[in-house]
């Protein structure tokens, strides 16, 4: 199979492969993810109570969310298609003393082998990096048990999002390497909600995650989904 058939963008994979060694550098290229992670992890745990539940993180990268979920008592599996990020994730889990099972596979391949196997599925800051996000969402829906919780987060597609997430984050504040994001791959909440409905998921909540460049902190803001946002859905 080609990477396109696997719903994988080889250029996106290569981008994160190059940066993998700095995944856990709190002041490096992934600092925004580290800053955002406590907010994401708390949001998920408050709504899904992850302790002792089987949780799958799709597009886990270097394992930032996986470790946070494992520390909260979840039984965590992380999947990704990048060799270098997965190696970094495995090594860091040994250093951290957390137990996470990391596997190189796509969501679609994994769903075919493990349908309805997880209580919670997370797919954060990943949908804007695949050729067909609707296909990934359908795979996530297949992986979660009936009544289980799914969380997606991504970036809205509008002029403000372009200004903040591309121009501001990559060129002005230099929080991210140039070229990290492709504006055309950003996803409007209405599009994500429709793809979730098509996959048999019921939207529970949508919330924005806003960044203050002065305090350098993120916070939840249910009234502002204009840039970063997270959606909580449940398998019907």
Curated annotation (Swiss-Prot):
Keyword S-adenosyl-L-methionine assigned to the entry: answer is: yes
Molecular function terms from GO: 2-polyprenyl-6-hydroxyphenol methylase activity; 3-demethylubiquinol 3-O-methyltransferase activity; polyprenyldihydroxybenzoate methyltransferase activity
Enzyme class, spelled out: transferase
Binding positions for S-adenosyl-L-methionine? 40, 59, 80, 124
UniProt keywords (A-Z) are: Methyltransferase, S-adenosyl-L-methionine, Transferase, Ubiquinone biosynthesis
Q: What pathway does the UniProt record associate with this protein?
A: Cofactor biosynthesis; ubiquinone biosynthesis
Record-level GO BP terms: methylation
Output the InterPro entries linked to this UniProt entry: SAM-dependent_MTases_sf, UbiG_MeTrfase
**EC number(s) given by UniProt:** 2.1.1.222, 2.1.1.64
Catalysed reaction per UniProt? a 3-demethylubiquinol + S-adenosyl-L-methionine = a ubiquinol + S-adenosyl-L-homocysteine + H(+); a 3-(all-trans-polyprenyl)benzene-1,2-diol + S-adenosyl-L-methionine = a 2-methoxy-6-(all-trans-polyprenyl)phenol + S-adenosyl-L-homocysteine + H(+)
Record's CDD domains? AdoMet_MTases
Q: Which family does it belong to?
A: Belongs to the methyltransferase superfamily. UbiG/COQ3 family.
Q: What is the purpose of this protein?
A: O-methyltransferase that catalyzes the 2 O-methylation steps in the ubiquinone biosynthetic pathway.
- Designated name of the protein: Ubiquinone biosynthesis O-methyltransferase
Q: Which organism is it from?
A: Saccharophagus degradans (strain 2-40 / ATCC 43961 / DSM 17024)
Give the gene name.
ubiG
């Amino acid at each position: 199979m080609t990477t396109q058939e696997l719903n994988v963008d080889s250029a996106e994979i290569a981008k994160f492969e190059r940066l993998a060694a700095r995944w856990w550098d709190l002041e490096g290229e992934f600092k925004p993810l580290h800053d955002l992670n406590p907010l994401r992890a708390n949001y998920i745990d408050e709504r899904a109570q992850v302790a002792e539940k089987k949780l799958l993180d799709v597009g886990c990268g270097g394992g930032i969310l996986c470790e946070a979920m494992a520390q909260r008592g979840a039984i965590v599996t992380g999947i990704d298609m990048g060799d270098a990020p997965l190696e970094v994730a495995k090594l860091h889990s040994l250093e951290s003393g957390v137990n996470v099972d990391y596997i190189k596979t796509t969501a679609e391949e994994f769903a075919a082998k493990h349908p309805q196997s997880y209580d919670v599925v997370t797919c954060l800051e990943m949908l804007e990096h695949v050729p067909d996000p609707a296909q990934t969402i359908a795979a996530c829906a297949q992986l979660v048990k009936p009544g289980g919780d799914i969380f997606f987060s991504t970036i809205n597609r509008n002029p403000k999002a372009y200004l903040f997430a591309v121009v501001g984050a990559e060129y002005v504040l230099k929080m991210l390497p140039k070229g990290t994001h492709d504006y055309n791959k950003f996803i409007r909440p209405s599009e994500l909600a429709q793809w979730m409905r098509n996959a048999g998921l019921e939207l529970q909540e949508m919330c924005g995650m806003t960044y203050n460049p002065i305090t350098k902190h993120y916070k939840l803001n249910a009234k502002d989904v204009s840039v970063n946002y997270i959606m909580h859905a449940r398998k019907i």
